[in-house]
Amino acid sequence: MPTLDSGKVCRIVARARALDTGRPENFPEDRARRELLEIIRTLNEREQVELVALCWVGRRTYAPEEWEEALSEARAAHSERTAEYLVGMPLLADCLEGGLARFGQGCSGFEDGNL
């Protein structure tokens, strides 16, 4: 089971949604992408590894019961480009929300204003 704070995951989900679904005209895509990259880069290595594993559980590459295996693979794949890997992942927000849901968690009630 992930130990990564779900509030951090929901913050990333909100930013990823802004990037995926369009932004207000005064919030260009490159700025949204840079902000999302920065949020992920501020996570420590353990948190980045868990975020990748959570994505993989969310997209059903791994089942929740295979969490330790997903973590092990994510740990082995971790690099200085992990943030870029995540931001480049299609449907990042959906993968993260799906991962949270598979562990009985979610982002309902999360306020985008908490960013």
Model feature map: region roles:
Residues 2-27:
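Short terminal alpha-helical segments
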Residues 8, 47-51, 66, 95:
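Residue-level detector of well-ordered alpha-helical segments, enriched
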Residues 24-42:
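Short amphipathic alpha-helical segments and their helix-coil junctions
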Residues 39-48, 90-91:
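Structural motif
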Residues 49-59:
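Short, hydrophobic/amphipathic alpha-helical patches that form generic packing surfaces
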Residues 57-69:
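Short helix-capping/linker segments at secondary-structure and domain boundaries
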Residues 74-115:
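Helix-rich interaction surfaces within compact, conserved domain-sized segments
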